[in-house]
Design a protein with these regions (language model features):
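Alpha-helical membrane-spanning segments of integral membrane proteins, especially the hydrophobic core
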Residues: 93-101, 128-144
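Transmembrane alpha-helix/helix-exit interface in multi-pass inner-membrane proteins
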Residues: 101-121, 149-156
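Interfacial segments of alpha-helical transmembrane regions
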Residues: 86-103, 176, 182
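Non-cytosolic membrane-interface motifs at loop->transmembrane helix junctions
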Residues: 49-58, 126-128, 198-209
Length: 245
C-alpha cells in the first residue's frame, strides 16, 4: 500500500479589482484644485521662494495623480501596476515612443507658431544652470523622467482603463471614448493655470494632440511603454534646447 501523494497547496485567490472612475476623478479633481490653490497663493504673495514655487508646481500635480494610482492598485486592485495599468515595456515601444514624441512635438510647435509667431514660447525658460542637485532634479529629472512616469500611469493607465470599463459600448467604441476623455483631462490639467487665452489654446491643443496619440498607442498595445517613451521625447525636446540656449 503506497502513501498518498500530498495535494499541492491551493493558489491564493486573485484579488478583486474595485478601482474605477471614482479613483480617477479624485486624482484629476485633486490635481486641478491644488494647481489653482498654488496659483492663488503665488499671485497673492504667499509663495516667494523660487525653488519652493518650482517644487510645488510639480507636487501639486504629482501627489494627487500618483496617490490615486497607488490607492487604486494596492488598496483596491491587484497590487500589480503591470496587471492593473499596463506598466510594461517591449522593445517595439521604443519605436512607437520616438515616432509619437517627435511627431506630436512638431504639431505642438506649429501651434506655437500660429499662436505666438515663433516656436518655443510655451517651452521652458531656465536661468543659467547651477549644475547642483536642485538643478539636476528640477530642470532635468522632474520634467523629462518623473513627470512622464507619473502622468502616464494616471492618464493612460488608471483614467483610460477606468473610462473604457465604464463605457457601455463595444470595446472599440469604449476605447475611442476613453482615449478622447483621457486626452481632454490631460490637456485640462496642463491649462488650468494658463496665463492668457493664447496660452490656453496653444498649450491645450498641443497637450490634447499628444494625449490622444499616447492614449491610442496604449489602447493598441495594452502597455504604457510606448506612451512613456513618447512623453520623455515630447518633454525633452522642450527642456534640452532650453538648457542649451
Amino acid at each position: 500500500m503506497t502513501a498518498a501523494t500530498p495535494a499541492a497547496p491551493a493558489s491564493p485567490p486573485a484579488r478583486r479589482v474595485r478601482w474605477g472612475l471614482d479613483d480617477a476623478a479624485v486624482g484629476a479633481v485633486g490635481a486641478i484644485l491644488l494647481v489653482l490653490a498654488a496659483d492663488w497663493a503665488l499671485s497673492h504673495g504667499y509663495l516667494t521662494d523660487p525653488r519652493l514655487v518650482e517644487v510645488l508646481s510639480y507636487l501639486v500635480v504629482w501627489v494627487p495623480l500618483l496617490g490615486s494610482v497607488l490607492v487604486a492598485c494596492y488598496l483596491r486592485g491587484s497590487r500589480s501596476l503591470a496587471r492593473d495599468f499596463g506598466l510594461r515595456f517591449h522593445p517595439l515601444d521604443l519605436l512607437w515612443g520616438l515616432t509619437i514624441g517627435l511627431l506630436t512635438r512638431v504639431v505642438a510647435s506649429l501651434f506655437e507658431i500660429a499662436g505666438y509667431g515663433q516656436m518655443g514660447t510655451t517651452g521652458a525658460t531656465l536661468d543659467a544652470p547651477a549644475h547642483d542637485a536642485w538643478w539636476i532634479v528640477l530642470a532635468l529629472l522632474a520634467p523629462v523622467l518623473i513627470a512622464p512616469l507619473i502622468e502616464e500611469l494616471f492618464f493612460r493607465g488608471l483614467l483610460l482603463r477606468a473610462v473604457a470599463a465604464a463605457t457601455d459600448a463595444r470595446r472599440p467604441v469604449a476605447l475611442a471614448v476613453a482615449c478622447a476623455v483621457s486626452a481632454l483631462v490631460f490637456a485640462l490639467v496642463h491649462v488650468v493655470d494658463a496665463g492668457s487665452p493664447t496660452a490656453l489654446w496653444v498649450v491645450g491643443a498641443g497637450t490634447f494632440v499628444f494625449g490622444l496619440a499616447a492614449a491610442s498607442v496604449t489602447a493598441v498595445t495594452g502597455r504604457l511603454g510606448g506612451a512613456m517613451v513618447a512623453h520623455v521625447v515630447f518633454n525633452g525636446l522642450v527642456v534640452v534646447p532650453a538648457l542649451l540656449r
